[in-house]
Amino acid sequence: MPFLDIQKRFGLNIDRWLTIQSGEQPYKMAGRCHAFEKEWIECAHGIGYTRAEKECKIEYDDFVECLLRQKTMRRAGTIRKQRDKLIKEGKYTPPPHHIGKGEPRP
């Protein structure tokens, strides 16, 4: 037990906010992946861990992708590599404002 329990003193429950986005949030703002987490929890509730691993895999994978965005970042990297390849071959010229030669803004 910490010497000064600041969370309890101020009536905060940061641990719950970080672990379950579906729980009550500060300022009543839903988390980014709230919908995916809610679907996963509703699917897995009451069926047990072993069955939930198999039956709720799609919901869990969607939730993890929303949190970590691994597929999105991989796709952005692939697009960037393709763009660089096209620039190198001379088939694509980026607009001037993308390469820092645009008009200066006030």
Curated annotation (Swiss-Prot):
Membrane topology: Peripheral membrane protein
Keywords: Disulfide bond, Electron transport, Membrane, Mitochondrion, Mitochondrion inner membrane, Respiratory chain, Transport
Top-level taxonomic group: Eukaryota
UniProt keyword annotation of Electron transport present: yes
Annotated PROSITE patterns: CHCH
Molecular functions (GO terms): NADH dehydrogenase (ubiquinone) activity
Family named by the database record: Belongs to the complex I NDUFS5 subunit family.
Protein name: NADH dehydrogenase [ubiquinone] iron-sulfur protein 5
Gene behind the chain: NDUFS5
